[in-house]
Amino acid sequence: MFDLGSQGVIMSHDNDWNKVRLELDKSDNFGAIYNSPWYTDAVYDKFSDEEFARRHAAARKLMARDGLDALILTGGPDIYSHGSGVTWGAGLIDDRGMCQYMILPLKGEPTLIYPHYGCHIEAARKQVSVRDVRSGQHGKYGKAVGERLIELGMQKARIGITAADRTGPEFMGVNAYLDMQKLLPQATFVFCPEMLHELTYLKGPEEIRAMAKAGQIAIKALQAVAATARPGMREYQLAAAVAPAVMNEGGRYHLLMIGSTSMHDPRIIFPNPNPSHRVLREGDIILSELAMSYMGYSAKIGHPVTIGKPTEKYNTFFKEVVVPGFEEVRGQLKPGNTLEAVRKTGSRVFRDRGAQSRPTIMHGLDLITSVPFVRADRIRAEPYETTMQPGMTYNIELTPVDKEGIFGIFFSRSFAITENGALDLTPFPVDEILVAG
C-alpha cells in the first residue's frame, strides 16, 4: 500500500486512497481523496523550503505587529492578481476559481484551500510547498476556510485578509466572506490591502532568479513576434506565436498586448490590450507589452518591431527621442536614489527633445505590476519605498509621443536594484528598432 502521509502530507479527512481505491466510482470517496500514487512522478520547479519558511516568518512578523492571529492570503487568475498571495505563500499556479485562499496562522500549520477536488487536488499537492491542502468543498470556500480557522481555535481571533486584486482593491468572494462570518461570528476580520506588497517589495535571491528567468522568457516572446510577423497575418496570430515560445520555457504569459499600425498613417501610440483582426502590411510598426512570468514572478519587455525597414520618421524618433530618454531614466536606477529623482528625469527627457509622453515612467514589481507608480506629474508609493534599496524591482515603462499626440512608441525593460546599481532582467539590445523576419 502507498502511504504518502508518511512523507509529511497533512490531511484532515478520512478518504485515504488506500481505503477507498476499490470504490472510486462513489462521489463521496473521490471528492476528498488523498494519499494516492497519482502524480507522484510529476516534477515542478519550486522555490526552496527555506525560501517559503522565510516568507511565512516575514508574514508572521507583520501579523504580530498588527495584532493578527491568522492571515488569509488570497489570489485569483485575473491579470491584476496572477495568483497574488496564494502563489507567494504556497507556490500554487492555477487558473481555477475566482479567488483562492491560504490560511497562515500566527502559530500552527498553514493550509491551502484548493478549488477543485479528486485528481485535480492531488496534482496540486505535488506542485505546492504547503503540506495541508484541502478541497474548496465545491465552491464553499468560506466554509472550508472557516472550518480550518475553528480547528485553530480562532473563534474570537483577529484575522487579516490580503488583497487578491491590487485594483480597488478587491479581497475575496462575497459568499465566502459571508460564510466565514456566519461560522465565526465573534471573530474580527481585518482587510490588509498593502500587506502583501510590504512582504514582496524587497526580493530575495531566489525571487530575483525567477524574475531573471521570466525576463529571458519575455525576450523569447518578443523574438517570436518578430520572427512571425509578415504581411497578410493578423494581430491575434502574433499573440498566438507568443504562447508556444513562452510555454516551451515553462513560463506563463501575464500581459500579452500587441497592436499594429501603418508607419505612414499611425493610429496607435500603445499596444492593443486585445490584439485585433487587423491584417499586417508592409510598412507597419508593431508595438507590444509582453509581461511573462516564471514560478509566479514576472518581468516585462516592450520593443518596436517593423515589417520592412522603419521609416525615417520613426527611426529618427526612436534614436533621438526614445533611446536617449530611456537611457537617462535607466541611469537613475541605483541604491540610495529616490523615486522623485526618477520622476523629475522622466518628466523632462522627452519634453527636452521636442516630444511628450504618456504619464507613466516606471512602476514596481511585486510578483506582477505594483506600487510604486512613478508618473511624470505624481508618485504613488509607500513611505518605506521612496528611496531605492537592493532587492527592489522595477519596470521602466515609457511611451514617448510626438508633440501633436499622433504617433508614439511603447518601450519597456525590467530591473532589480543591486548593491552597485541595477541588474537588467530583460537584457535585450536597445539601440535599434527590430525588423521582422
Identify the function of each model-found stretch.
Residues 1-437:
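Active-site neighborhoods and metal-handling regions in enzymes and metal-associated proteins
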